[in-house]
């Protein structure tokens, strides 16, 4: 299935649905919202197992699960609305200079473009960070996130841009999207600098560190799989101009051990 994921540039729908039904996108979600609320080391072990099979799938599991910890920062009713559906997945992309939110009565008018939103195909909601334009001049949330807010939007309200063709992570479906003058209610926004409602367990770890440790674990899992494949090949292949297996060559010992 890994070849199919890479070719199709997404996790197959039947597989992502099965993963969602079995709770693999709710591993770090609080138990109060129907999640597993795993301890961080246990989560990383699961990531490494997935990465050993397919790096893109593991990447999406990390991205989508780590974002779910923000459920403790956003309004409680909004978190319940989003994760009340078992197959709920929120994808987010880093802020860009092409985004802005203008305050209006009861919320914001949101416009912009965002990139690298991993898991776009199986996501149900979008989280778009944008600076608040308050009359003090233009802002760039990609450089200064002070005062920026994250807007939570059903996926069917954004314009999807198929621009993702990256070797190695092609299957993450990390596509771009655009929004033009969309009204977002205030209760579907939050400030990412807000402290979570409780900081026990994994929720006491900064979000940036959660992302970093998860993605580095994905890299380690892929590396382990690559080493195993190399060792397997070395035990079967006889290189040209040699009568001995590759595993007996000094160069193999130097590189692999």
Where are these regions (language model features)?
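Well-ordered mid-protein domain cores that form the structural environment of catalytic cofactors
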Residues: 68-106
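A generic local secondary-structure boundary/capping motif
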Residues: 89, 98-100, 114-118, 137-142, ...
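Active-site glycine-rich loop that binds ribose-phosphate moieties when present
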Residues: 92-94, 130, 152-166
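DPxDG-like acidic metal-binding loop motif
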Residues: 113-157
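Glycine-rich beta->alpha junctions and the first turn(s) of the following alpha-helix
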Residues: 167-257
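Alpha-helical interface subdomain recognition
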Residues: 1-29, 35-45, 217-257
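Internal helix-loop-helix
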Residues: 24-81
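A generic structural signal for beta-strand entry/edge sites
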Residues: 105-111, 125, 174
């Amino acid at each position: 299935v890994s070849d199919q994921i890479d070719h199709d540039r997404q996790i197959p729908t039947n597989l992502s649905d099965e993963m969602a039904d079995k709770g693999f996108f709710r591993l770090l979600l609080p138990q109060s919202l129907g999640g597993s609320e795993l301890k961080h080391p246990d989560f990383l072990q699961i990531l490494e197992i997935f990465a050993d099979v397919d790096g893109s799938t593991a990447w999406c599991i990390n991205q989508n699960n780590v974002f779910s910890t923000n459920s403790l920062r956003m309004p409680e009713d909004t978190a319940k609305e989003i994760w009340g559906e078992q197959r709920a997945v929120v994808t987010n992309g880093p802020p860009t200079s092409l985004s802005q939110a203008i305050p209006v009565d009861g919320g914001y008018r949101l416009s912009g473009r965002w990139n690298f939103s991993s898991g776009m195909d199986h996501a149900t909601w979008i989280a778009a960070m944008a600076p608040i334009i308050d009359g003090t001049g233009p802002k760039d949330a990609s450089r200064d996130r002070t005062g920026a807010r994250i807007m939570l939007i059903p996926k069917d309200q954004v314009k999807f841009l198929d621009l993702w063709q990256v070797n190695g992570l092609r299957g993450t479906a990390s596509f771009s999207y655009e929004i033009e003058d969309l009204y977002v209610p205030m209760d579907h926004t939050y400030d990412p600098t807000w402290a979570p409602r409780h900081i026990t367990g994994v929720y006491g770890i900064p979000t940036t560190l959660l992302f970093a440790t998860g993605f580095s674990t994905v890299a380690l899992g892929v590396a382990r799989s690559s080493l195993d494949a190399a060792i397997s090949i070395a035990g079967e292949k006889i290189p040209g101009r040699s009568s001995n297996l590759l595993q007996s060559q000094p160069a193999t010992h130097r590189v692999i051990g």
